[in-house]
């Protein structure tokens, strides 16, 4: 949604001016192996405007780069309503899932914020702080 305001006769974007944001989540199971599920999540959104700490938005602003991310995951049902052992340790659980996820599959460097550095001439430069790049995650979830 495009949001802007007029400051001192100049139209500037508001701090929440994110013109687009698209997200997709898809999950499915494999027909031959119904206990194995696959999930895919994708996000792309416009960057937010930001201003140096000692300036006003009417003076100058920069826009962060677009945020892009794709996550994939596989989950395997170890114990469930159709696959419950009658005795032993696992018989006390309703469900147990073992999962493997790859966050930020494309290894994209997304900017979270900026660290502002001032030089001797009192000029400020935006140094980006990046979010975590590609990361693998193994999870075990259980319900009683």
Which residues fall in each region the model found?
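Active-site/pore-lining binding-face segments in mid-to-C-terminal subdomains
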Residues: 55-58, 62, 70-72, 84
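Gram-negative outer-membrane beta-barrel transporters
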Residues: 1-51
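Residues embedded in well-ordered secondary-structure elements
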Residues: 15, 27-29, 61-63, 89, ...
């Amino acid at each position: 949604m495009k949001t802007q305001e007029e400051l001192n006769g100049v139209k500037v974007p508001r701090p929440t001016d994110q013109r687009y944001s698209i997200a997709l989540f898809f999950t499915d199971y494999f027909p031959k192996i119904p206990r194995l599920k696959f999930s895919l999540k994708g996000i792309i959104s416009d960057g937010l405007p930001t201003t140096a700490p000692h300036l006003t938005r009417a003076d100058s602003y920069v826009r962060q780069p677009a945020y892009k991310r794709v996550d994939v995951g596989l989950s395997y049902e170890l114990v469930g309503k159709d696959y419950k052992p009658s005795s032993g340790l696992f018989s006390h659980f309703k469900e147990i899932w073992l999962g493997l996820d790859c966050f930020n599959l494309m290894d994209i460097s997304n900017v979270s914020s900026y660290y502002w550095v001032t030089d001797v001439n009192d000029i400020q430069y935006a140094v980006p702080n990046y979010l975590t790049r590609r990361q693998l995650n193994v999870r075990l979830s259980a319900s009683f």
